[in-house]
Amino acid sequence: MQESELLHNQLKVEELKKEEEIENNLEKKKTPGIDMKRVNLIKKRDEDIIAENIQGELKEEERENIKVKEKEIKEEKKEKENYPCMQIIDQEGIFADENQKERITFEEFIQENTKFKELGFNYNMLSILGPQNSGKSTLLNYLFDTDFTVLNEKNGRQRTTRGVWLGLVGDRKDIIIMDLEGSDGSIREDDLSFERKISLFSLSVCSVLMVNIWSHDVGRYGASNMSLLKNIFELNLQLFQKEDSPKTLILFVIRDRDQKKPFENTKSVLLEDIMKIWDNVARPECFKRAPIDKFFDLEFTSLPHFKHDKELFIQEVKELKKRFDCKNQNTYFRSIYNKEIPADGLALFTKQVWSSIKSNKDLDLPSQKEMLARFRCDELIENIFNEFEKEIEEIKIKHSEKHIFNNFKIFCDCLYDKKMKEFMNIASKYLDRVVKEKADLLSEKMLNEISYLFQTQMTLAINYIKTMLTTSYVTLKNQYITEQSSLFDPTKYAGYAEQMDDFNITIKNEWEKISTQSVPSNIENNFEIEINTLDRFINKLYEIGRRDLIEALMTHFKKHLQNIMKPLLLPLFEQSNKNMWEQVRKIVLETTSQNLQELENGMINSLKMNKDDVEKKLNELQVYIIDAVRSTILERPGFVSNLMENKFISIFRLDNEGLPKKWKQNEDLSKPYFKAKAEAEKILDLFSYIRMDPKDDNFSFISINPATGKKMIIEEPENGVIDQTKVLFSLSERLSIYEGFQNMAEANFMRAQQELAAITVHSKTPMWLILLIAFLSFDNIVYVLKSPTLLALTLIIIAIIYSLNKFGYAYLIDSVISFILSISWSSVLYLIQDLGLFKNLLPKPEAPKRKRPQKKIQDDKPKSPLLVTHKKLPSVMGDVTIDNIDSLNSFDDAFKLVGHDEKPIRKPFRPLPNRETQSMRNIPTSASFTKSQSMFIKRNITTASSLNKPNETKEF
């Protein structure tokens, strides 16, 4: 606009001068009779016009200065706001990659133009080359409405464009225009390296090269543009040596064309020069005979003089502008020229290309594109993955609170697909090979994170189901176990069965829902084993729960029977008659038949059992009846031992009236002893086996050893095969009971012998011996009689001895005397020494020396180093596996294997005492034993308790 205004003012001044010359000529031709007044007016008008012109020129300069300043301010403001154009490479060859105050970076320029970033490959780049001050910037400004700086002729011919300037134009801002520094500037002189570098740079990124040529340079081989063309050809061969490399369109714009000279002639001359240059260009061997159109498409156009034919220039530029519209069928921007550099990666690509060019490295565009693709993909991966991590933070927070994340699968699948789609939408513009590689990397990173969250999700889910199982089944079990303490009512078990069914359905549905919603589609389900295991574990626990509920009902029925039968059975057991088991069977049959229908109705109606299972359980009822009878016998500790002892004492120690027997002199004790012992042994045989079948009455567990003729306890009767469920006491328990009974019987027998011996000794003492003892001890008797103290003490001792002798405890006196005599002199010395008596007088006895066992000398073998073994982390299902689920028999086994930390609440119960130790504890203590007898009993009990091998017998 400035040039047009100046031109307009100059033309106006020239017109005024011409008018003045015309007026002067007319004045000379006029005759002397001319009106001078008119002449003076004309002169005055001319002077006013000249003054106005002078003043106008001054004002015009002021206006120009103001406009320049306003333009600078406007450009600065525009640069800061929209960055329509920028200097991408300055005159020193520095790329705009650092945020400097005087210019923005290329990356910022692209970031500000968000529409351009989204274009992908759908944009075009054009650069213009040519001599300095050849009107390149002016042409671009008129052609693309850019605002590049143009030459100010008042300042003389100088370098206007410095380095490389870039502008973003077009309705969609899809055209990038690069204005390159002139090729023959005086400042560079003979330094052609910068010219060559920016030419190579434009070839690397631009699909169209405009070569600005003056018309008078056409045909002159030494013109600067010819060397420029040579550079372009050589550099293009250097860059694009692959068969599939894109072509480049070179548009020759011939400026200031001669209107008198046909354009076709100019074109043919220029084309001839181009072919000469192409023939002389050094080419690789593979392209020695390659024509120029293999690499370039050549287009030619011309424009009139800008100053002399400005209107025509503007008109033809408008026509030329249509060829740069992509919608035009004859557009210069054809897809075959596209260098396929994504819009969002253009800044990085140009930076890398210029860095290689500037450092004089071999420029490998495929490698640069691959490098760009890798960098941009890595950048995308980092950004997308950071966003991905922010979005999954919601899951991590939920997991940290030990809560399951609902709809885990949908959330992860949608998030994964969303992020992969975002990546592919942006990265698909780059090299397919690199994009696929980086897409796999991003996918792997996200799936690793999802997999980790999936493991946490499944662990929490399985623990949640385990807690549900434990809470549900154990709580329910505690309820129906508590029910057993109340009256037997099978209808109450209906509610427990319904609750258990509801628990099972609820837990199954919850687990199916959680497991279905927790397995993302894109990861490998490494919890299949745990899922299948937990499925079977849930079914197994339901099976155990149903079985335990049925067992609880049967146990309740057993206790019910036991409570009914106990008052009837205990008198029979205490009497221990021969027909005891016959009477027991009668009572059991009557009691069972009265309550069996109630049990059957409870199993069918309350527990919803089918007829086959009910029939099976009723067939097993015999086991519960046997168990009830067994519980009645064993609930009293030492019941059988007491019966045997009472039976033995009632026969051996008591008479028919139940009073203690008084033995007669020389009475045979063996007959009542063996009789009482035989009767007591029958009780042991009677209670060895629960005889619920009449055939069982024929079984006997005491036999005679044919070799020795002594009785022995056998494990199984010789006349049949027994049912192990009916065995009341094992062989070792029977041996223990018999040992205790044997010791008790022997103690009573020894006591009876002592009583009988005392009677015999008392009756055999002669009278003369008594008189002789009295005569010899007369002095002592008199001394005692004179001393009241000794007399009283003597009478007391005599009374005690008399009482002991009368009641059969004379053997205690013998035991005391034996104990006193058994104390050695060394023991007395030890006692005195410990009490501190006669410390200075009595020597301290030597302690007996004990031989220490010599340690075995071990071979000096080198010790192997300790192996540090890492403990295997417990599985989320603990020790439960598919293989051992079927072996689970109880909730305790199941929860122990599954590794549940929360112990279910159970009511305390008293375990049944061990029968063997119980039998040993309950050895009859009605008789008093001496120390030696007690040691004898303990030794025999220990021996008996160690006899626990099958089919082992013991003779007595």
Swiss-Prot record:
GO molecular function: GTP binding; GTPase activity
Primary localisation category: endoplasmic reticulum
Gene Ontology annotations for the cellular component aspect, listed alphabetically: endoplasmic reticulum membrane
Cytoplasmic side stretches: 1-764, 810-956
Keyword presence, Coiled coil: yes
Transmembrane segments: 765-785, 789-809
Positions that bind GTP: G130, P131, Q132, N133, S134, G135, K136, S137
Region of interest (Disordered), ranges: 906-929
Lumenal compartment segments: 786-788
Compositionally skewed regions (Polar residues) per UniProt: 915-929
Enzyme type, top EC level: hydrolase
EC number from the UniProt entry: 3.6.5.-
Leader sequence segment: none
Classification via InterPro entries: G_GB1_RHD3_dom, P-loop_NTPase, RHD3/Sey1, Sey1/RHD3-like_3HB
Annotated GO biological process: endoplasmic reticulum membrane fusion
Protein's membrane topology: Multi-pass membrane protein
Entry-linked Gene3D superfamilies: P-loop containing nucleotide triphosphate hydrolases
Family classification: Belongs to the TRAFAC class dynamin-like GTPase superfamily. GB1/RHD3 GTPase family. RHD3 subfamily.
Job of this protein: Probable GTP-binding protein that may be involved in cell development.
Protein name (database record): Protein SEY1 homolog 1
